Structure formats: C-alpha cells, structure tokens
Amino acid sequence: AGTAMFFYSGKAHCDKDRKNRIVRCVLSMMIFGMISLTGYMNGCAMSKQERLAEELDGQQPGGIEGKVYEIRQSGDEWRVYVYAEWITFGGGDSEETVEYRGRSKVLLYMEDVESLKTGMKLTLSCSLSRPDSADNPGEFDAREYYSHKGIYIVGKDISILECGEDYSRIGDILFRLRIKSGEIIDSVFGETDGSVIKAMLLGDKSGIDRDTKKLFQMNGIAHILAISGVHIAIIGMTLFGVLRRLTGSYMASGIMAISVIVLYGVMTGMASSTVRAMIMMVISVIGQVKGRSPDMLTSAGTASVIQALIDPGIILDAGFQLSFAAVLGMAVPGSLMKKLIPTKNKVVSTLVMNLAITLATGPLVIFYYYQFPLYSIFLNLLIVPLVSVIIFVSIGVIAAMLIFPGILQGNEMAVCIGAFPVKLILAIYRQLCEWAMELPFYSINTGHVSVMMIVVFYMAMVGVLILLVRAKSADCARVRRRMVCLCAAVIMTLCC
C-alpha cells in the first residue's frame, strides 16, 4: 500500500497541472485504502488459519475437503498442495471435534498420485499435524518456511474417500509435461548434472545432492538454481523478440510471450522469485506494446504489492527478500555507481552492477546464512553469462526429445553432442568454485547480525553513494564533512 501511494503521490508532485495533481493524490489515497483493506482481510484470514493449526496437538486424525492446485515430486514421495474448503480433526474420547470452513492451504504427503489431477476436488481422511519446527539454531525450520507460503497444516497417511471427475486440463498437461521433461533431463544429462538442470528449468531442487548444493552456496552462486529474473528474462524476452520479428506486431507477440511465461511459471511451481520476475516482465512487455519505457522501481513495487496482497506472509520469506534486494540493488546503488564510474567497457559495467547487487543482497545473505562468500562478485561475472547457454541448449534438447522421441532415443551420438555444452559448463562451474575455495578467506563466517545493523548498513551505503555522486559537482570540503558525520553516526549506532 505504501509503495502504491508513494508512486502515485510522487507522480502527482511532479505534475505541473494543479487539477491533475489533485486527481492523482485522491487516486493514490483510494489505492492506499483499497490495498490496506485487502491486505488486512488477507492477514486476518492467515491469522485464523494459524490459530486453527495451534489447536493441533501432535498427530491427530482428521478429514479434508478441497481442490488440488499443485502436485510435486520430492524424492520417492509426492507433495500434493490442496486448497481446503473444510477441515476437521479431533473427536476422540477426551477431545472436542474442531471444524473449520474456509479456504486454507494444506500440504499432503503421498506415495501415489496416479488417481489425482490438478484442479480435482477430493475428500480424504488423514493424520493432521503442524510442520516440524527446528530443534537447534541454524537447522531448517519447516514450520516457519511453510508459514511464509501460507501453509500451517500438513497431512500424512492419506486415505482418499472420494474424487471428483472434473479437473484442470491445462494444469494436468503442464504437470505431465513437467514430469516428462524431468525424465528426459535425467536420461540425457545424468543424475548429477540433471538435478542441476531440473532446478534451473523446472524449479525442482529435490534431486540436487548435498555436495553440489553446498558448493554453490559457499561460493555465492546458488541463485542460478532458482528460477528468477535471469531465467525469465532469457526465456520470456527472447521469445518476445523472436515473435515480434516473425509477426511484426507488438500486441500479438506480447500476448503470446506473456501467455507462455505465465504457463511456464505455473508449471514450475510459482516460486516467489519466479512470480516477481513474471510480473516485472509482463509490465515491461505491456510498456513496450504501448510504446513506453518500463521503470524498474515501479515494476518491482507493483510486483511486491501484488505478491504481498495474495500472500501477506511472503514478505518474511528469504527468497522473496533476496529477489527484491537484487532488483533494488540494480536500481538504486547500481545507478549511483554508474554515475561514479561512467564507462563504456561492458566488463567493467557488469562488474560494477555485480558489486551493487552484492552490496544489496550481502546483508540478507549474512542474516539468513551467517556467512559471506567473498569472491562471489568475480565468480558471478564468469558464471551468469553462461546461464543463457545452459537454458537454451537444455530447452532445445528437451524439445527435440519431445518432438522426435523415436529418432533420438536410439541415437546416443546425437544426444551426447546436444548435452556436451551443458555438461562442460557445469564442470567449469564446479572447477571455478573449487578453485575459489582454495583461496584465503573465500567464505567469511559472520555469525548472527541484528536487523538494526542491516538497516544502518543500507542507510549508510545509500548515503555514502549519494554524497560521492554529489562530490563530483559540489564543494568537496563540504561533502567530506558530511561523510565524516555520516560515518560517525553509523559507528555510534553499531556500538549502541
């Protein structure tokens, strides 16, 4: 709500026409009120679901009626996500039956999903409980993780009592395509490399071995395993550009590109970073169709408001925060650093932007993971440009195997040639990470930092960059005095 009001009131302030200023201010207040009311209602609904989950005492038998909205495989088991319309549990000799009617998300752990399809209504009995909480500091906290996604109850030992006949045809096609694509990736790229490709293309991280995940995390390149702005930009904007040249129409190519990206997001699970990138891409495409240039801060602000309205708990999710921190890093410190270091050299420009993103995301990385990969700036400079090659080649291999399964299945040479560039790049990634880990101070263990320290860092970073930019055109002595005062204030705040 604040983002929307800030944007529209800012536009109103810049408008020279008094009548337009009044209209924009009124519009901004109306939007603020509508968004605040919607957010409050969603927040109340989430609080009610959380209170319902708190009444669960360990594992309790219960029943659910609802609709399946996502099916995902995790190792040998399946995770079925349901929008429950009715939940009941308890009712033993000394227990009171608890009944809840209202839409809420429930996660079901199942061994077989052959009878289930996306969009299907079902009635089932199961053992209900809350997600497991962390016993030790630093341990994965499933309860907190799923609460950020609006899930407070999980079900096990499922017994399906009734299944509806209607289901989502599009959802089922996307589910089958995802499963088939995963099988192709495993058969072509092997188990180790295939797990990385599935994470990058399908959003499936369940198969990544612990060593690979730790190697990428310790070197600050684990973001390539999540479907984010890089992936959406590569796929969506490339598709938009190709279709625009083929059709000659901004409108037709925009509609087709947006449709493909939305379907791709649904197929891969609609992670927070994926949704953010999708919304920003849609705004960018609409802007180009209308002949206007998109603004990164406006697009990011709109995406954050939409996501927070749909799921208020997502603002506490680490992936959500890191995703928007990276965008804000490019928009704020990135633009300021470009003014400080004006250059036409693409390598230097990319290095400056990587530094800006690292400055923006670094405090959050330290806050959540208690360590900072020192050489991630330089590793990302080498690794990110090759992501597009992995994506295009992998999509090409999957498409070829889907279109010509009979021809390519028996032709091992063609499959090996198609997979070679991807396997080579992933081998280079691993080797670069291993070399970086041999350098001194490759990963700095910082321990826990407070929220106040992060806020002070961001304020100091932006303040220093603004003062440095002004130093190029203002009185240097005055700027130096301001910088000394700013540094003294930061040190005093940190000491307190």
Predicted regions mapped to residue ranges:
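N-terminal leader/targeting segments
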Residues: 1-52, 276, 467-480
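Short amphipathic alpha-helical coupling elements at transmembrane boundaries
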Residues: 183, 214, 244, 261, ...
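Alpha-helical transmembrane segments of multi-pass integral membrane proteins
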Residues: 329-441
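Non-globular, low-confidence helical/coil segments that flank catalytic cores
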Residues: 66, 88-92, 112-127, 138, ...
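Short acidic/histidine-centered micro-motifs embedded in hydrophobic/aromatic stretches
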Residues: 199, 203, 258, 424
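Membrane-interface helix/helix-cap signal primarily in integral membrane proteins
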Residues: 33, 37-223
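Hydrophobic alpha-helical transmembrane segments in multi-pass membrane proteins
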Residues: 2-10, 210-377, 393, 449-496
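Divalent metal-coordination and catalytic microenvironments
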Residues: 66, 126, 200, 228, ...
